């Protein structure tokens, strides 16, 4: 026995073989006639016992033309990267700076936070993270909200 599944409608074997001409789920007149995907569920011989196995759906694959591939590439614009810069200050303790960096920047480890804090302390500033402009501005505002001096600048890719 087989059960036909079309979209979200499952037709039991009884409706396939004992259907009336006016039945709206009749396979010859039903909603499956114009569908491109029709799956069959092979069930065991005894109805109501055991599960079934789904056969692989038949899907028509169309490969996009050369023009559409270029259109997809054009539509996917990658946001230019921006740097979040931490500036050295004389009023926040080093431990506090490490805690804020770990709290504000997702995935920031203790070792990375300590290295960034040390670089800012020694050199006057340090790159905290390079990300999209919206994320960089959000991180900068969160750092400032916690009392740290920070800024955002485009990532030029230089030293």
UniProtKB/Swiss-Prot annotation:
Protein's cellular compartments: Plastid, Chloroplast stroma
Tissue specificity here reads: Expressed exclusively in photosynthetic green tissues with high levels in young, developing leaf tissues.
Q: Signal peptide position in this chain?
A: none
State whether keyword Plastid applies: yes
Checking InterPro entries in the record gives: ClpS, ClpS_core, Ribosomal_bL12_C/ClpS-like
- Pfam families cross-referenced by the UniProt entry: ClpS
Q: What is its main location?
A: plastid
Outline where the chain's transit peptide begins and ends. Answer: 1-44
One of the GO BP terms on file: protein catabolic process
* A GO cellular component annotation in the UniProt record: chloroplast stroma
Q: Which UniProt keywords apply?
A: Chloroplast, Hydrolase, Plastid, Protease, Transit peptide
Superkingdom of origin organism: Eukaryota
What are the GO MF terms of this UniProt record? peptidase activity; protein-macromolecule adaptor activity
**Phenotypic consequence of gene deletion:** No visible phenotype. Weak chloroplast phenotype under short-day conditions.
User: Any idea what job this protein has?
Assistant: Small adapter protein that modulate the activity of CLPC. Involved in plastid biogenesis in particular when chloroplast protein synthesis capacity is a limiting factor. Probably involved in substrate selection for plastid Clp protease system. Recruitment to ClpC chaperones is facilitated by CLPF thus forming a binary adapter for selective substrate recognition and delivery to plastid Clp protease system (CLPC).
- Its quaternary structure? Interacts with CLPC1 (via N-terminus) and CLPC2, but not with CLPt1 or CLPT2. Binds to ClpF; this interaction stimulates their association with ClpC.
Q: Which family does it belong to?
A: Belongs to the ClpS family.
Name of the featured protein:
ATP-dependent Clp protease adapter protein CLPS1, chloroplastic
């Amino acid at each position: 026995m087989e059960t036909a599944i079309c979209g979200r409608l499952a037709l039991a074997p009884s409706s396939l073989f004992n259907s009336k001409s006016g039945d709206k789920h009749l396979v010859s007149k039903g909603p499956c006639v114009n569908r491109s995907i029709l799956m069959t569920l092979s069930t065991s011989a005894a109805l109501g016992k055991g599960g079934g196995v789904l056969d692989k759906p038949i899907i028509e694959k169309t490969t996009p033309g050369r023009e559409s591939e270029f259109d997809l590439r054009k539509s996917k614009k990658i946001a230019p990267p921006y740097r979040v810069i931490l500036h050295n200050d004389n009023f926040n303790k080093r431990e506090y700076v490490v805690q804020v960096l770990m709290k504000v920047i997702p995935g920031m480890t203790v070792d990375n936070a300590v290295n960034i804090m040390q670089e800012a302390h020694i050199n006057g500033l340090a790159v905290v993270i390079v990300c999209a402009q919206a994320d960089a501005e959000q991180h900068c505002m969160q750092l400032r909200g916690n009392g740290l001096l920070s800024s955002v600048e485009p990532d030029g890719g230089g030293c």
